[in-house]
Regions:
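Carbohydrate transferase catalytic cores enriched for Leloir-type hexosyltransferases
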Residues: 1-418
Length: 418
């Protein structure tokens, strides 16, 4: 579950009690490999549990209401997420739930069994804290009911906003999700005490909207962390050059450009000189043309689509790649790009502000309209040995953000808030 880059590392002590919202992690059980947002919430769970001297609780919205877990409950929940302990049997409510998968039903049943307190949908359970902070890092459970209930307890509210992409790029969103996202963000703007932004670019977009809604909030900006990469990886054993694209297969990620490039390469190169492309991610929404193209290309020897690759296998695949391809029209933070840079794997990406902020001069920046430049760069890297590429890129890799630095920034901002 935890994948790459969720170990907090050493950070200064957290002197205040915390209620961490774990709704996102609970809702993702049984739904495939963890996403970037999942991994951030998991990193926060690790951090909150790392300080034994102050109270920590977890709040989750599940089918039928809310549950609160104490430290022991959170430790057990984390062990189950990691696969160290099995999920238990589904209880009666889960077995009767027609909208709940078997795995999620088991997870929600365990949450009910582990709960120190429970409530229905209309109000929160009693949280035995009068001082401290509620942390929401998963873009989940951000309703006015939930946040108003938290405010009534006297806790301060700190919300991590990953991006404002649904409002900036509504054309790429599923039907109905833009308004729901705006409702969430308006609740965050009206009821939060602190906003955590993962980049200056995100902070600017959040503040643009929040200022329009009359929310004069303090912000702390801190890049998300990537775990230390000291282990030598047993990389993929395929000797043919290959490239990797990571992320949900949705319109914003612009996989169509990559398919266009590889179709051109197929016409221009002998079969034995064709680089491969691995597309890693679940199929998303509003992308039927790309799905049809992928289906029609299933017999192509140069194309691999992985919809449920685990984190360890993905990390090994990325480590052996000739490059990570990121042709997205917009990105929130882009953890895979940072992880590629940490390994010394080349990155080819669009000319987005977030890439410049975090990666500096490390990537090759290519205009998304310039298919020739993308193809030329891919071919140039294909002709080099992967080890030589990695050696050259490690020498120029940017400063890699750490979770320790991130949590030190958040800790300082929350301490000031209290």
């Amino acid at each position: 579950m935890h994948g790459v880059g969720t170990k907090p590392g050493t950070t200064i002590n957290r002197p205040y009690p915390v209620v961490l919202d774990i709704t996102r992690l609970a809702s993702r059980v049984g739904r495939g490999p963890s996403t970037g947002v999942d991994r951030v919430e998991f990193a926060y769970l690790n951090w909150c549990l790392s300080e034994d001297s102050v109270p920590v609780y977890g709040l989750a919205r599940i089918s039928g209401g809310f549950v609160v877990l104490d430290r022991e409950g959170l430790l057990s929940f984390r062990s189950k997420l990691l696969g160290e302990l099995p999920w238990g049997r589904r209880d009666v409510r889960a077995r009767l739930g027609i909208r709940t998968s078997t795995q999620r039903g088991a997870a929600e049943s365990d949450l009910r069994r582990l709960a120190a307190a429970r409530s229905g949908r209309e109000s929160l359970p009693d949280i035995p804290l009068e001082h401290g902070v509620y942390l929401n890092t998963g873009h989940s459970n951000l309703s006015e009911t939930s946040l108003s209930g938290i405010r009534k307890t006297g806790l301060k509210i700190a919300t991590l906003v990953h991006d404002m992409i649904p409002l900036d790029w509504p054309q790429f969103q599923r039907e109905g999700t833009v308004q729901r996202f705006e409702d969430k963000m308006q609740a965050v703007a009206g009821l939060s005490d602190l906003i955590i932004a993962n980049s200056e670019g995100t902070r600017e977009r959040v503040q643009y909207y929040f200022d329009q809604w009359g929310a004069g909030l303090p912000y702390v900006t801190s890049h998300l962390g990537v775990g230390q990469n000291s282990k030598i990886l047993d990389i993929s054993g395929d000797n043919r050059p290959y490239f990797v694209a990571i992320g949900t297969i949705e319109p914003r990620k612009n996989h169509a450009l990559l398919l266009d490039i590889w179709e051109r390469l197929e016409k221009e190169l002998p079969h034995e000189q064709m680089p491969m492309i691995h597309i890693v991610g679940q199929r998303g929404w509003k992308n039927e043309d790309v799905f049809q193209r992928l289906d029609s290309m299933q017999n192509k020897s140069w194309l691999y689509e992985h919809n449920s690759m685990d984190d360890v296998t993905l990390r090994r695949l990325l480590a052996g790649a000739h490059g990570l391809l990121v042709p997205s029209f917009a990105e929130g933070f882009g953890l895979p790009s940072i992880e590629a840079a940490q390994m010394g794997v080349p990155v080819i990406c669009g000319d987005l502000a977030i890439h410049h902020e975090v990666l500096g001069d490390y990537p090759v920046y290519a205009d998304l309209q310039d298919i020739y430049l993308w193809k030329k760069t891919i071919l140039e890297q294909t002709k080099q040995r992967q080890k030589d590429l990695v050696h050259a890129h490690r020498a120029k890799k940017p400063k890699i953000p750490t979770w320790s630095e991130h949590f030190d920034d958040v800790n300082a901002a929350v301490t000031k808030l209290l």
